[in-house]
């Protein structure tokens, strides 16, 4: 540890970071040993405050628009200098971590934060290597100064906070942001831009591995079940959110998990429950007077979170990676109650549904989405994090699926028996039954039934799952109402898909009217 007038705490232990956070009034200890913090008025990501510096390497390679907003290079340099000078005048924390577990694909990152707790968060979520940057790669810098306030008129930002990626300089600037998920997603976006150049598909998915070495991927937006379903006591966890798929390997981009905590229970999510202990960070979780977390309390936000390192998960892949996936699962939370609990997809359907990314925003991670639930289409099941045009990722996915022979499934973790407010949400044990059947190989070559309007094939039998749930039309009391809802959903799919320039075979793989 180096001390100066303004102390710089470099690569100190997790215990020391917890100590510093409490000493500075950044958070408090919960009864389970975790550090509990509040993130202020931002309790989720702030997409309107995220920018990418426009320069020669990015100018023609990025899908510019509302998600990827351009930022002038000169404005970035001025703001970086301003934030860095501000931070150098106060105590701060530095850690050296990797982003990407596979030797060939890691990025070395110098992470500087103004708060001890955000440094601990980064240490939970990124990878603490035994040896830092053994290959001597160019270093990335993350500068995360939560107590700096941007001035839009002066700095060119949208508000008092910003997240700006600069690929030319290998820098990520985060200012005025207390919600630590911004740091994790910023580095994910960096890898999502860089990995396709190496013929690696970056994915917003969870991954786990069975005793036999079989790997399953779970794609899905926040709240669809990635973290919950991949945390399976019978399998080894690779990771819960960000992975790369290259020839012969699926590897975690991270070294930890970022689990939603709302209504967390030991019964339904034992792996996550046990992982929340000393060294973990709880964001925006309410404690009772005994300091016991009340996970049902959403008075601060629906998007309460736990960050913990993979070492807190007993059954995990020691190397943070596995082989190529036998099963690829697209998780969708369907609010309409139209989609079946499981559909078996061919390659064209896989491309169609990957590009569509249909789901719901459930207890959304984005600011301004409120507690309301609404349907959305999020390309690649993670549009906010993929800087290149969607076709780049879709082509890589199909290339990988074809080369390895992965089987692809669409799994609905949303509503059945009617839409939101009428039907009910599939319970976790039912969805776990579907996943277990997929992983056992029981659905390979299974007899299927074709559902016309939504153009999906559903297995007639899924071991461990009630047969009457498999065809969603059967679960609706009013069959005509189901048909109308199915047509309505098909229209949404068709309308959304107009923006993609793809082959007729892929277009024909979606819902038809």
Curated annotation (Swiss-Prot):
Involved in the gluconeogenesis. Catalyzes the conversion of oxaloacetate (OAA) to phosphoenolpyruvate (PEP) through direct phosphoryl transfer between the nucleoside triphosphate and OAA. This is Phosphoenolpyruvate carboxykinase (ATP). Substrate binds at residues 45, 179, 185, 305. Mn(2+) binds at residues 185, 204, 241. Binds 1 Mn(2+) ion per subunit. Pathway: Carbohydrate biosynthesis; gluconeogenesis. Belongs to the phosphoenolpyruvate carboxykinase (ATP) family. ATP binds at residues 185, 204, 220-228, 269, 305, 431. Transmembrane segments: none annotated. Its cofactor is Mn(2+). The gene is pckA. It is found in: Cytoplasm. Keywords: ATP-binding, Cytoplasm, Decarboxylase, Gluconeogenesis, Lyase, Manganese, Metal-binding, Nucleotide-binding. Its EC number is 4.1.1.49. Its main location: cytoplasm. It catalyses: oxaloacetate + ATP = phosphoenolpyruvate + ADP + CO2. InterPro entries: PEP_carboxykinase_ATP, PEP_carboxykinase_C, PEP_carboxykinase_N, PEPCK_ATP_CS. Monomer. Signal peptide: none annotated. It comes from Pseudomonas aeruginosa (strain UCBPP-PA14). Pfam families: PEPCK_ATP. It is an enzyme of class 4 (lyase). GO terms for molecular function: ATP binding; metal ion binding; phosphoenolpyruvate carboxykinase (ATP) activity. GO terms for biological process: gluconeogenesis. It comes from the Bacteria. GO terms for cellular component: cytosol.
């Amino acid at each position: 540890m180096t001390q100066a007038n303004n102390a710089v705490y470099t690569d100190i232990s997790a215990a020391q970071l917890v100590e510093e956070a409490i000493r500075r009034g950044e958070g408090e200890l919960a009864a389970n040993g975790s550090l509990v913090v509040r993130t202020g008025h931002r309790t989720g990501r702030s997409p309107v405050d995220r920018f990418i510096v426009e320069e020669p390497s990015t100018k023609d390679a990025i899908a510019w628009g509302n998600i990827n907003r351009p930022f002038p290079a000169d404005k970035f340099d001025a703001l970086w200098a301003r934030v860095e000078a501000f931070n150098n005048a106060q105590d701060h924390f530095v850690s050296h971590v990797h982003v990407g577990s596979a030797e060939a694909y890691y990025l070395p990152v110098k992470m500087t934060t103004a708060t001890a707790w955000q440094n601990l968060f980064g240490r939970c979520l990124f990878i603490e290597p035994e040896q830092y940057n053994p290959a001597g790669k160019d270093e990335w810098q993350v500068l995360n100064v939560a107590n700096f306030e941007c001035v839009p008129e002066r700095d060119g930002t949208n508000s008092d906070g910003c997240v700006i990626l600069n690929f030319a300089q290998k820098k990520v600037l985060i200012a005025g942001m207390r919600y630590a998920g911004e740091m994790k997603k910023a580095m994910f976006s960096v890898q999502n831009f860089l990995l396709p150049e190496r013929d690696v598909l970056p994915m917003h998915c969870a991954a786990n591995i069975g005793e036999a070495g079989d790997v399953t991927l779970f794609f899905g937006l926040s709240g669809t079940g990635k973290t919950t379903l991949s945390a399976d006591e019978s399998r080894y966890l690779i990771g819960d959110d960000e992975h790369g798929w290259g020839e012969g390997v699926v590897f975690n981009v991270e070294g930890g998990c970022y689990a939603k905590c709302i209504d967390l229970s030991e019964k339904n999510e034992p792996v996550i429950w046990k992982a929340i202990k000393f060294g973990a960070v709880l964001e925006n979780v309410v404690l009772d007077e005994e300091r016991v977390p009340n996970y049902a309390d959403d008075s601060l936000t629906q998007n309460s979170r736990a960050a913990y390192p993979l070492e807190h998960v007993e059954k995990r892949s020691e190397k943070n990676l596995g082989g190529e996936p036998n099963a690829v699962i697209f998780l969708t939370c369907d609010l309409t109650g139209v989609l079946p609990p499981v559909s078996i997809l061919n390659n064209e359907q896989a491309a169609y549904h990957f590009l569509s990314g249909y789901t719901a925003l459930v207890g959304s991670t984005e600011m301004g989405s409120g507690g309301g639930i609404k349907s959305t289409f999020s390309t690649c099941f993670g549009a906010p994090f993929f800087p290149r045009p969607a076709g780049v990722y879709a082509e890589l996915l199909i290339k990988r699926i074809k080369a390895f022979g992965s089987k692809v499934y669409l799994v609905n973790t949303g509503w059945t028996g009617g839409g939101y407010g009428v039907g009910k949400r599939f319970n976790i044990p039912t969805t776990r039954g579907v996943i277990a059947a997929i992983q056992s190989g029981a659905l390979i070559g299974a007899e299927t039934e074709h559902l016309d309007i939504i153009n999906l094939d559903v297995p007639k039998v899924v071991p461990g799952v009630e047969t009457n749930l498999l065809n969603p039309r059967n679960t609706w009391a009013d069959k005509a109402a189901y048909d109308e809802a199915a047509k309505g959903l098909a229209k949404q799919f068709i309308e959304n898909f107009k923006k993609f320039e793809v082959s007729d075979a892929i277009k024909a793989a979606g819902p038809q009217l």
